[in-house]
Amino acid sequence: MSKRKLVLSVVTAFIIVCLFGIVIIEPAEIWSRIKQNNEGMKVGYSDSVVYDGNHYKLLHPIGEKNESRYISLPDLKAITSVETAEKDEELTISYKNKKLTYDNGFIQNCSLTKDDMCGYEIIDGLIYIPDQSVERLGFQIGFFYDKQTNTVSIKSPEEQAKKPQDQELGSTIYVHKENVPAEKYEPRSGIYLGGYVLQDEYIDTSMNTFNKLTGKTHASYFKYVGYGKPFPKEWAEEVIAAGGFPQVAWEPNNGLNEVKDDEYLRQFAKDAGELNVPILLRYASEMNGTWTFYSGHSEQYIEKWKLVHDVMEKEAPNVMMLWNVFTMPESTIDEFYPGDEYVDYVGVNIYNVFYHNDKIEAKSDFEDPLRLLDYVYNTYSHKKPIVIGEFGVTNYTVTDGQHHDDFAVEKITRMYKYLPELYPRVKFIYYFDVNNLVNAPEGRKINNYAITEKKSILNAYAANVKTDQYLSKVEGDPAKSETYSYRDFFFYYGGELYADYKFVRDYLNMDVKESRGNSMKVTFNGKGIDVKQESLKIDKAAFFEKREVKGLPLGEILDAFEVENEIKDGDLHIQIAK
């Protein structure tokens, strides 16, 4: 900015103040702020922005100065669809019925109070707008998840008008396929509703009472059984009498060496087979963590898994083998996978807590239960239906000694309201209805997950599971068609949607290989094309970590191979002929 323009800006500001009697900043301070605005901005923010739940790769980095964040005008236009008009020294930025008009770099009629940023920056010929000015257009600027990740979030006025549990869902990629074989007892029209009540003393551990309170017969309930204990026939009969079928969480808590092809294993399997109802067998779950007696031994784990699978296949064909992990850590999950032919369903346990590991400094209230599902869902749902083996939300924690009823209502509502629509490959979900303050071992009496003790939480659960999409009985004759979905692991850049290469490979069944430079070769039906890869690090759902999305331009790929697709309500629908 030239000295002549600086003087003109100061004089203009002074005249505005005189004419309108607005609270002013002294001329000396105006000069000081103009000088500061010509100094370099600090960087260090993520090169991604989340807008209404979708990831965008920035064309230019976000900067910070005087506690204000600046976003380039080209990025603001690409992300939010604001409109601009320029005439002489005047720039107008508008969104819906709001607009900012700049004259010589300053907003017309700006009050110039100490809390306002009335000007923009010009760096390397680009205009940068401060967050306060963007918010004048009705947007809300903050951090996505938590400021520790340095990822800026922008919410449109329309997004802000929604309830918290409905915000920042983002877009979904759907893939529709025909002639898809179903797994054992797999429903195609909804999700089997399940629960765990054996430690809910408030309802005397009664499945019938739980069904009555929630207004819905649950299709399944589960029970923990230690390896070496007999098959729980009496309890299984109680589940059947309550209108459901059992899930057995079978845990080799003395280690994997005790798992052998012996009389105990065979009898357990025979007892399960004699029940003549579907049984979901969650054998040796959460092995990806460090807290089980069978963690850290992936080769032995797979060997024993295959043994159990083969025995069940022979003695109890009604058993569905559920391979079930915990949400974190992700890095160890795949090394325990036994192989497609040995697994019927893939599951994950998900918990929303206010603090991690009873640490007041490890606040985690921002975590989204749906995004906690994304890694397992995106990694495995193209080949196996998905189960949420346990889901729980804290409503009270000893960490801060506070009740968090609103937190529980929000997370439960978000999970059960949107799960059927956004994650059609999820086929079971079990709520963990336990007050751990009473029923957990010492050292784990931290959170209360029970929904039956407080009316507001119970009502939130009941209201969202009452739909026909949550099933109360086993579905027969499943449809041949199936809808797949893919969430979060994609971003927008330069007006193009970039999906992780694994989506192209696994969900579209295309061959993907590295090519020259920063390109990948995609082959489909004998035809090959080279496409440019763009990478972006996005926030993981927990623990302030990042994941790298190696994105491929999806529109370019679909057009090149003439794959049928369309956009509906912001979501991409792809039709795959099979």
Segments and roles (model prediction):
Residues 193-271, 411, 418, 423, ...:
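N-terminal carbohydrate-binding/catalytic regions of secreted carbohydrate-active enzymes
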Residues 258-280, 301-315, 319, 335, ...:
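An active-site-proximal structural segment forming one wall of the substrate-binding cleft
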Residues 189-194, 278-280, 285, 387-389, ...:
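Substrate-binding cleft of secreted/luminal carbohydrate-active enzymes
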Residues 2-173, 473-578:
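Primary recognition of N-terminal secretory signal peptides and signal-anchoring hydrophobic helices
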Residues 193-195, 219-223, 246-249, 279-283, ...:
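Hydrophobic faces of well-ordered beta-strands that scaffold small-molecule active sites
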